[in-house]
Amino acid sequence: MRLSQIRDFLAVVESGGIRAAARKLGVSQPAITRSVRGLEAELHARLLQRTPTGVVPTLPGRAFLARARVAQAELRKAEEEVDQLGQRVGSVAFGVSPTSAMMVPEAVSRFRQQFPQARVRIAEGLPNLLIPLVRDETLDFAICRQAVVKPDSALAFRPLFRNDFAVVCRRGHPLEKARSLAGLAEASWISLLPLDAPGGPFDRAFSPAGLSVPKQVIQCESYNTAIGLLAKTDMLGFLSRQLLAESILRDFLQQIPVAEPLPSFIVGMFTRTDTPLTQVAGAMAKSVIVASRVLARAA
């Protein structure tokens, strides 16, 4: 099996066809076809099939695709590691959840002092988006909540700081003077997580208080959309208390200080267990860890 075969296979899958893959790689279509057929012959399996919408991987092809992406990512990291020796170049890609994004400015500033020429890519999203990108090595690491991720031997988790949930609403909300969850149970709510997600705030807040989870809950997997709904409607939601206090959100959102204790959660760093970070990615990870200590003291 040659690296060029893996490259060609990935190009076909990502482009959706032989012609598009050939154009992307700057080679002829027959060359791509021979390469993929040779790979299939070596693996004794058909990896690709034509459909009305384009070329897609077969079941064996999907299994090989996951490994091929990891192999390509490992090769790219190996090349970067060699380039980085004795130089201050290279690249790092990492993900942050909205809560953990608070420490990015401090972390990047520290990192730039050591690697001013390195390429940095930052992805923001919820854990269900970021964690798969760590698994397939699209991201070097991700900073997000622990509880929403099922145990996985491929991932390592390093706790960084604890955060607290708060009930939030828009300023001037008719329920802003409520002081118990019971007084909010009939309101409309928005959730960034599925209600049955491990460690989610709804069950952990309402059940200990002897209350049922609110019936009117909209699940919204977009952080910006959720913030817009909270700011422009009478919906309620659970957000990080520290995020509300340290960001511009406090200009148009406020906390409802209910009497019941609300759950907290751990934010930490997810990395792959079988792949060491490159020199540059490791330096960024260390900068994030240092920046997180400020949040840990403020929590």
Language model feature labels by segment:
Residues 10-28:
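Short helix-boundary/capping micro-motifs
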Residues 29-30, 77, 87-115, 119-123, ...:
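N-terminal winged-helix
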Residues 40-57:
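A short LG(V/I)-centered, amphipathic sequence patch enriched
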Residues 104, 175-179, 187-209, 277-286, ...:
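Secondary-structure junction motif
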Residues 106-110, 128-165, 169, 178, ...:
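Short beta-strand-centered segments that line the small-molecule binding cleft or hinge
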Residues 126-139, 145, 195-254:
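Hydrophobic hinge/microswitch elements
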Residues 151-158, 163, 224-273:
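Beta-alpha-beta core module
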Residues 155-190, 194, 272:
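Flexible hinge/capping segments at coil-to-helix
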